[in-house]
Each structure stands twice: as structure tokens, then as C-alpha cells.
Regions:
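TPR/TPR-like alpha-solenoid helical repeat scaffolds
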Residues: 217-228
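Alpha-helical transmembrane bundle of multi-pass membrane proteins
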Residues: 1-201, 207, 228-448
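Short intracellular "coupling" helices and adjacent cytoplasmic loop segments at the cytosolic face
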Residues: 208-219
Length: 448
């Protein structure tokens, strides 16, 4: 592929960087905001979770708009919400303004999480769609890691008399502006253009993206034309031909969260502070280490994604997570806290490996692949909203679970182990195999 084509996929996936950056940045900023604004525990919790409320709303709301106006215009709009939300959080004056700012930021994050998987899937050729579609999750992990580094860099440094946490939150402006500039340069999805009758521009974009023979573009256009002939029921398609896809999208996104990934991302420092008595600096460095593991393994996942069946990788990841979490649970109930600390750290890293090689990228990849063109925007939105609702549930109840189990991390991680075990059977019996198939082939399989 030409370098400018990689530029398209890089900027197309940049919403994931902002998604991950916001996820990671609040873990370092929230204790500082709590202290600065003298917030109650409940208010601090709401500041953290407000973005999840906005994200669920943004994910659900953007789908119908994307199917009507296109992916590109909505990505540009999401970048403007990112810019506005970043500025609002950096200049918040108290609980109320911070909560509103976080909801605005959530609208942007949720919109990007629904738009990007569908957009990348519609741009990528079938044989590279796994790797290119996985760039969204790679960007999420890169954003999380950059946020951890930003937290460490700004912590305790009140440049120009401005509090450190304001610099942390304001630093999101850099990728937000990049997304806006990139959005202006990105092409519209060729499949969206074709579906709207603009076959000339669809062919032009495809020819540029493929940079191959005209025959391969013609074959792809012919497949689009075949799908375009199929009867379309509008939103009714969600409850008829797309119903299996809706079940898979909701299930895979709920399970991606219920295996506990964001308990690690949001609360890992608190796990080691409350559960093992680590000081704050060491706990944050552990988070950085886990962030590096997450990022590096996701790079590996993008490299191998088109070499293995999606279901094979998902099952492998489920087994690794189940075993790591089960051992972690037993360990923390059978040995002393001092003895369990280092093995727990290693088992969490193993669990992250299992997630990052499979469920991290593939869940987002699938929601961009499995829906028919007529409802791909709204279908991707439903899957993304399910992810945010699951995220909200995990983030709200993790610390409660930790307290219920008397700060023994084996308790909540044991619950996550059960969901990881359930995910094995969900993949086996419900998830379709999409590797190597064109989006049109996947849609025709749904219609059979």
C-alpha cells in the first residue's frame, strides 16, 4: 500500500487514540481533581463515570446519522466535540462544570467508538481487514499508554501557575486537533458512497485505496452492486436479517467489559495500594508497565490478525484469561498478601496478554464487519453502546466488590474469571467466522 493510504487508515483510527487517552488520563487526574475541588467520593465517582454516560448516548445517537450523512462528516463532528470537551475539562471550575465537560467528552468518545470500526471495515480489503481494522484497538492502547506517561510527566508540575491535572486533561487537545485535520483529508467510505448512488466517487476512492489492478476494484464494485439489489427494510433489517448480528454485537461487547479489562485500566493503582499496601508512585509505575504490555501485545495482534481465524484467537484469549484469573483468585485466598503481590502482578500481565491478543481488537473489528450495509452504522452504534454500558457497570461496581471482599483482589477477579469462562461458549456457538470474507459475502451469508 502507498504511504498516503496508510495515512488514511492511521487518521481513520485516530478516534481510538482519544478514546484510550481519556480512559487512561482520568486515573491519574481524578485524585488531584478530588483534592482541588474538595469533592465527595460520590462526586469523584460521577466525574469518572460521566464520560461513560455521554459515550453510551453518543454511540447510540451517531449510528442513524452515519447511515444518513456518512462516516467522514460525523468523524469531523466528533473531533469538534473532542476539542470542546478537552478545553472544558481543562478549564472546569468545580464539580458541575467538570461533570458537564466529561459528558461532552463522552459524546465524542462514544461517537468515535461507533464510527471508526465501521469506517475502517468499509475501507479495508478483505484479506487485510483484520490487521487494518485492529488499528482502532491499537490506537486505544497507545492512547492509554500516552495518558499514563502524561500523568507521570505533569504530576506535581504546576506550569505557569496552572494545576498539574489541568495540563493532563488539556493535553488531549493535541490528538483532538490532529483528528479534526485528518478528518478533513479523509475520503468518504466507498461503500457508503455506492449505497447512496454515487458510484463514480465510490470507484475513485476504491481505486486509490487498493492501488492494484482495475479488475480487483471492478470485482469489489460488482459485489457491492449485488448486495445493493437485495431488498432493504431500513431499521426493520435490525430485527430480521441482522438479528443474529445484533445478538453477537451486544454479547461480545458486554463480555469484553465483563471480563474486567477496565477494572485494570481504571483502578490498577488502587488495587495495589488498597490490596497490597504499595505506595502511589510504585502503583502508577505498575500501571505503566501493564500499559506497555497491553500496547505491545496489541501490535502483535494486528500483525497476526489475518493469519488466524477470529474464533480461534477469541477462544485462545478466553482460555488464557480464564486460567490467569482463576489462578489469581485461588492465590489471593491461599497465601499471604506479601507473597501474593508479585505473582498477582505477573498474572494480571498474563491476563492482559490474553485480552490484547484477542478480545481487545476483535470485538471492535467484528462490530464493523457483521452488519449489512443498510444498518451498519446503527448496528455498530448498538454494539458500541453495549460496550459503554458494560464499561459503566464494571467501573461502578469494581471498588464496591473489592470492599465486599475486604480488599482481597481475588474476589472481583474471581467474578471476572466466571465471565471469561462463559465467553468460551459464546464464541463457540454464536460468533460467526469473518476472516478472509468480503463485507458483501458476510452480508449474503446473513441473508441465507
Amino acid at each position: 500500500m502507498k504511504i498516503n493510504v496508510w495515512f488514511i487508515f492511521f487518521f481513520g483510527a485516530l478516534g481510538g487514540l482519544l478514546f484510550g487517552f481519556d480512559t487512561g488520563i482520568i486515573s491519574g487526574a481524578s485524585p488531584l481533581i478530588e483534592s482541588n475541588f474538595k469533592l465527595t467520593v460520590a462526586e469523584t465517582g460521577f466525574v469518572t463515570s460521566a464520560v461513560l454516560i455521554g459515550s453510551a448516548a453518543g454511540a447510540l445517537g451517531v449510528g442513524p446519522l452515519a447511515d444518513r450523512f456518512g462516516r467522514k462528516k460525523l468523524l469531523i463532528l466528533a473531533s469538534l466535540f473532542f476539542i470542546a470537551g478537552s478545553l472544558m475539562t481543562a478549564f472546569a471550575t468545580g464539580f458541575g462544570t467538570m461533570a458537564i465537560a466529561r459528558i461532552v467528552l463522552g459524546l465524542a468518545v462514544g461517537s468515535a467508538s461507533a464510527l471508526t470500526p465501521a469506517y475502517l471495515a468499509e475501507l479495508a480489503p478483505a484479506k487485510h481487514r483484520g490487521s487494518l481494522g485492529s488499528m482502532f484497538q491499537l490506537m486505544i492502547t497507545a492512547g492509554i499508554l500516552l495518558a499514563y506517561v502524561s500523568n507521570l510527566g505533569f504530576l506535581g508540575h504546576d506550569f505557569m501557575g496552572i494545576r498539574d491535572w489541568r495540563w493532563m486533561l488539556g493535553s488531549a487537545l493535541i490528538p483532538a486537533v490532529l483528528l479534526f485535520i485528518g478528518g478533513l483529508l479523509l475520503p468518504e467510505s466507498p461503500r457508503f458512497l455506492f449505497a447512496k448512488g454515487d458510484k463514480e466517487n465510490a470507484e475513485r476512492v476504491l481505486t486509490h485505496l487498493r492501488a492494484k489492478s482495475g479488475e480487483s476494484v471492478e470485482a469489489e464494485l460488482a459485489a457491492m452492486a449485488e448486495v445493493d439489489k437485495q431488498p432493504k427494510g431500513g431499521l426493520k433489517d435490525l430485527f430480521t436479517i441482522a438479528r443474529p448480528a445484533v445478538i453477537v454485537a451486544i454479547g461480545i461487547m458486554f463480555l469484553q467489559q465483563l471480563v474486567g479489562i477496565n477494572s485494570v485500566i481504571y483502578f490498577l493503582p488502587q488495587v495495589f495500594i488498597k490490596g497490597f499496601g504499595f505506595n502511589e508512585a510504585n502503583a502508577i509505575w505498575i500501571s505503566v508497565g501493564i500499559g506497555v504490555v497491553n500496547f505491545v501485545v496489541t501490535i502483535l495482534a494486528t500483525m497476526i490478525m489475518d493469519n488466524f481465524n477470529r474464533k480461534t484467537l477469541l477462544t485462545f484469549g478466553s482460555v488464557v484469561m480464564t486460567v490467569a484469573l482463576a489462578i489469581l483468585t485461588v492465590l489471593n485466598y491461599t497465601v499471604s498478601v506479601e507473597t501474593a503481590a508479585i505473582p498477582t502482578m505477573l498474572l494480571i500481565a498474563t491476563y492482559i496478554f490474553g485480552f490484547a491478543i484477542s478480545w481487545g481488537p476483535i470485538a471492535w473489528l467484528l462490530i464493523g464487519e457483521i452488519f449489512p450495509m443498510s444498518v451498519r452504522g446503527i448496528g455498530s452504534s448498538i454494539g458500541s453502546a453495549a460496550n459503554w454500558i458494560g464499561n459503566f457497570l464494571v467501573s461502578q461496581f469494581f471498588l464496591v466488590l473489592l470492599a465486599v471482599f475486604h480488599n482481597n483482589v481475588g474476589g472481583p477477579f474471581g467474578v471476572f474469571a466466571v465471565f471469561a469462562f462463559i465467553s468460551i461458549f459464546f464464541v463457540r456457538y454464536l460468533v460467526p467466522e469473518t476472516r478472509g470474507k468480503s463485507l458483501e459475502e458476510i452480508e449474503m451469508d446473513l441473508r441465507k
